[in-house]
Amino acid sequence: MERTLAHVPSMELSTEALLVTGGLDNTNKMITSSAVRNDDGTMISQHSEKVSYGTSGAPDGSTPPVTAAGGGSEGNGIGGGGGGGGGMVGDGTGHSVGSSASGNDDDKPAKQKRHRTRFTPAQLNELERNFAKTHYPDIFMREEIAMRVGLTESRVQVWFQNRRAKWKKRKKTTNVFRTPGALLPSHGLAQFPSPMNDSFCNFHGQDTRGWPAMSGMTTHMAPHMTTHMPSHQMSQMGGGPGSALALPPSIPRQGLGQSMQQQTVNCTMGQSTGLNTLSMGTNGSMGSMTSMYQPSLGGMTTGSMSSGLSSPSPPNLPVSDSSTDLSCSVSDAGDMWRGTSIASLRRKALEHAASLNGNL
């Protein structure tokens, strides 16, 4: 680096000299300071009016000749040993300019954000149609599709990848829901007895479209009720909430009440008849009770059907009162069964005691 000053006063020279030689060693500082304190101008080169100070020199301490910035003469300046890198450079007017080596800061281009591709309905229809043909199109097919829909081949490839992933996910979900027993409870539902299944299936299959079908249903239902249903099932059927559902909705309230009254009268008459026949055998009493209940049920169904045909009414009338009457009558019948069995046991006990006394 070079330092050149021209027509500089002693005060400015001393200040500038101190600034320049601040980075040198102590020996150069002393020499330069002595030269600055000497104000008679002896340190100024005789061949030029400018003074040149070398801040870098050869290893042996000598400085190469320096060309003055203001003239064509050369002069030897006072210089020291090895110099450093950056320094102050004069511009010929007494002002110093700092020089520094700065790295090249290359501005990196901002990363472009890829916008989401928006497909038109026509493009989606074409892509879906090709996806229905094949899920894995080759490069030629993708290029052909891209030309048809106005997209790039890479966009078409990405769309097929996303579409395959969506299809696999949907297929997996569908297979989970289609697995037998995946969402069903582990325990099975209780099965109805076979006679009840037959009767209720016949009832729902006919769907109350004609009263002859209903009469056939009741005729089919009566023997099952008399032969296959015990007393507690009959009471549950009569008193439970399902009894109102078991009746057809078009049965009128008046006809149903008349049939219930007729059935109650039959039950009371059967009770008196059953009490009068206690002296008979057990088999005979059971047979009489069966024969007694069969006509009563037959009378109930026949009376209700005839009353329903004579006076039709809307199907939405409540039948809670009639179901209550039916439950009371059937529960009375169950009590009569229970009383008959106890009486027969007592009668057998008395007969056994009498036979024992006779043997004695």
Curated annotation (Swiss-Prot):
Q: Which GO terms describe its molecular function?
A: DNA binding; DNA-binding transcription factor activity, RNA polymerase II-specific
Q: Name one GO biological process term.
A: neuron differentiation
**Family matches, as SUPFAM superfamilies:** Homeodomain-like
Alphabetical list of SMART domains matching this protein: HOX (SM00389)
Q: Where does it reside?
A: Nucleus
| Region entry Disordered, spans | 48-117, 295-326
Q: Key word Transcription present in the record?
A: yes
What Pfam families does UniProt report for this protein, alphabetically? Homeodomain, OAR
Residue spans with biased composition (Low complexity)? Answer: 295-311
**What is the organism of origin for this protein?**
Lytechinus variegatus (Green sea urchin)
**Which UniProt keywords are listed?**
Developmental protein, DNA-binding, Homeobox, Nucleus, Transcription, Transcription regulation
What's the protein here called?
Homeobox protein orthopedia
* Cellular component GO terms held in the UniProt record: nucleus
Q: Does the keyword Aminoacyl-tRNA synthetase apply?
A: no
Q: Which domain of life is it from?
A: Eukaryota
Q: Enumerate the InterPro entries for this protein.
A: HD (IPR001356), Homeobox_CS (IPR017970), Homeodomain-like_sf (IPR009057), HTH_motif (IPR000047), OAR_dom (IPR003654), OTP_Homeobox (IPR051895)
Motif OAR, per the record, lies over 340-353
- Give residue spans, biased composition: Gly residues: 69-95
**Family of this protein:** Belongs to the paired homeobox family. Bicoid subfamily.
Residues within the DNA-binding region(s):
112-171
